[in-house]
């Protein structure tokens, strides 16, 4: 595996962990992980990159080795502001190459619409996979949020790291033993009771009171000026959420069409965690596009 180095920087009053691969003077790529994930998730893609890159991958607030926010709810706009601060720190004067998976893809694509001059190229890995909400869902959503405020969610614990690895493979049967063991090592830590839990603030599991407004997202996407590559798995998350793979594919194509300069690539034999399932092909697509 390619070696990484850790750095801790101050981002909007929080201590952020940032993982680096490659020479500091090499061309930069920023990689943004998804929900209940962390920067180590990109190790397998980085191992498959053939060109010389300086890969910069933060742990989002409340994930991995980054500091927890201290609030009982995490808000999407904070990720945008955190990303802007990170880019100012590492690339204050130049537009950047962004790669985001899932939540990271959502953040990167909205940011690219809000700050089009700051993004040179964007690769979204299974981003934009949330189901559209309707206004009628608002009362129930607020009720759910209030209920969770009275009964905060927690994180499951495991007796050993091997159990963490087994759980990861249960969630994703395509994950190999070797990769599951690596992820368990970097995703989990022992608590005071000697049990293992994911390195994440349990508050991330609290439902957002805000609905997913697709029209607002597509408006942001329409403002993107950078070339965008949407990479989806053969078994995309949106298709699973819609209980229809063909309908999910059609929805992905509809949404991507909102981006002026965009293309879609599908990775065979991969699901939502395509960076774990087929990192060789994902790395090839990334470098071909960049």
Residues covered by each model-derived region:
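Conserved HGGG/HGGXW glycine-rich cap/lid loop of the alpha/beta-hydrolase fold
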Residues: 17-68
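A catalytic-pocket lid/entrance helix-loop region that shapes and gates access to the active site
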Residues: 125-158
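Conserved loop-alpha-helix segment in the C-terminal half of the alpha/beta-hydrolase fold
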Residues: 223-270
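Alpha/beta-hydrolase fold catalytic core
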Residues: 1-29, 50-53, 92-94, 129, ...
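Conserved hydrolase catalytic core segment
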Residues: 93-138
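Active-site loop/oxyanion-hole signature of alpha/beta-hydrolase fold enzymes
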Residues: 11-14, 57-99, 267, 284
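Catalytic active-site module of serine/aspartate enzymes centered on a nucleophile-bearing elbow/loop
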Residues: 258-290
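Conserved alpha/beta-hydrolase catalytic His-Asp/Glu region
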Residues: 154-214
């Amino acid at each position: 595996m390619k070696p990484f180095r850790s750095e801790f920087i101050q981002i909007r009053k929080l201590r952020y962990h940032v993982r680096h691969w490659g020479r500091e003077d090499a061309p930069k790529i920023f990689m943004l992980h998804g929900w209940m994930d962390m920067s180590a998730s990109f190790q397998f893609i980085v191992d498959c990159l053939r060109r010389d890159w300086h890969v910069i991958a933060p742990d989002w607030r409340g994930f991995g080795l980054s500091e927890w926010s201290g609030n009982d709810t995490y808000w999407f706009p904070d990720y945008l502001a955190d990303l802007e601060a990170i880019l100012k720190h590492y690339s204050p004067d130049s537009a950047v190459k962004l790669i985001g998976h899932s939540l990271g893809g959502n953040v990167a694509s909205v940011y690219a619409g809000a700050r089009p001059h700051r993004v040179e190229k964007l690769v979204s890995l299974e981003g934009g996979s949330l189901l559209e909400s309707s206004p009628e869902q608002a009362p129930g959503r607020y009720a759910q949020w209030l209920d969770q405020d009275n009964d905060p969610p927690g994180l499951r614990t495991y007796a050993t790291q091997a159990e963490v690895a087994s759980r990861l493979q249960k969630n994703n049967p395509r994950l190999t033993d070797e990769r599951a063991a690596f992820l368990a090592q970097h995703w989990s830590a022992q608590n005071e009771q000697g049990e293992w839990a994911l390195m994440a603030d349990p508050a991330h599991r609290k439902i957002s009171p805000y609905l997913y407004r697709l029209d607002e997202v597509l408006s942001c996407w329409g403002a993107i000026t950078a070339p965008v590559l949407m990479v989806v798995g053969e078994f995309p998350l949106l298709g699973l959420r819609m209980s229809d793979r063909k309908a999910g594919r059609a929805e992905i194509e509809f949404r991507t069409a909102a981006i002026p300069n965009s293309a879609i690539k599908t990775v065979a034999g991969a699901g939502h965690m395509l960076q774990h399932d087929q990192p060789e092909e994902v790395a090839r697509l990334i470098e071909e596009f960049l």
